[in-house]
């Protein structure tokens, strides 16, 4: 089916690429795609295009990569050029998903139907940069995707629609991300169909209660503090997969922990100091925590690959009584 509603799309990572692909496949014309500039990545630190740019180029879409859209920012000339491009590109609405650049009011005012954001949480919970990670880390039972009419605030716009998704006990940020991306893609296509048909999308202001912020994940958060309860650490490991991973330091070596589950305290676990390995078995490495213990089932040594505990121990033996370092507490 071919649609007439013209969509400028702004986004950067895989989460956004899923939405762009759905919009394109649904038959909406996309006269322009905005995405972040290419960035160095990988071991060779070569410049790499974003997932959104890769999709757009593959399908013959025009792409712009301004470093900023703020005239008062660090790149005023580039911002001015990008804003002029938006003004001169005929379109009806802008869809924004994990773009990574601030959109000033001047930009929000350009599309006739405004700017619609696809956000990976049930707003107003987890506004900000890392909503998927923080929902898992906090132990939330569910999360979701919210479509909102953008304003200049940080994810504060009026809500158009949401989809709720349960968080499974074994979900990682990677697995949950993929379900949320698919849900967001479905939501935005349905919303664009309604916008084209009705000319408007009703939206409800976000409630004042229940606001939380999902701050960007920093590498410094990766270190596991074994003084915390085992269930908290298990959630941290799941939340930090694929980035930055949970890190445990043993004899100066940083070992990444990729899969773990809490186990009840009994016997030697109950009396062992936090960070102490109480068992190193093929089924997993059991480490004492502030309360309970963590059975780690997937590990990675520096320069190595993720391995199941059985394979990891075959090449890098661990033994009961060894102790992971405790990170400094700010």
From Swiss-Prot:
Q: Which InterPro entries match?
A: Fmt (IPR005794), Formyl_trans_C (IPR005793), Formyl_trans_C_sf (IPR037022), Formyl_transf_N (IPR002376), Formyl_transf_N_sf (IPR036477), Formyl_transferase-like_C_sf (IPR011034), GART_AS (IPR001555), Met-tRNA-FMT_C (IPR044135)
Q: Name one Pfam family in it.
A: Formyl_trans_C
Protein keywords:
Protein biosynthesis, Transferase
Establish whether keyword Protein biosynthesis is in the entry.
Answer: yes
Q: Does the keyword Oxidoreductase apply?
A: no
Q: What is its EC number?
A: 2.1.2.9
Ligand binding ((6S)-5,6,7,8-tetrahydrofolate)? 121-124
Which GO molecular function annotation, any one, does this entry have? methionyl-tRNA formyltransferase activity
- Residues in a coiled coil are none
**Which residue pairs form cystines in this protein?**
none
Q: Name one GO cellular component term.
A: cytosol
Q: Its catalytic activity?
A: L-methionyl-tRNA(fMet) + (6R)-10-formyltetrahydrofolate = N-formyl-L-methionyl-tRNA(fMet) + (6S)-5,6,7,8-tetrahydrofolate + H(+)
Q: Record's superkingdom? A: Bacteria
**What's its job?**
Attaches a formyl group to the free amino group of methionyl-tRNA(fMet). The formyl group appears to play a dual role in the initiator identity of N-formylmethionyl-tRNA by promoting its recognition by IF2 and preventing the misappropriation of this tRNA by the elongation apparatus.
**NCBIfam families from the xrefs?**
fmt
The similarity annotation says:
Belongs to the Fmt family.
* Protein name per UniProt: Methionyl-tRNA formyltransferase
Q: What is the lineage of its organism?
A: Bacteria, Pseudomonadati, Pseudomonadota, Betaproteobacteria, Burkholderiales
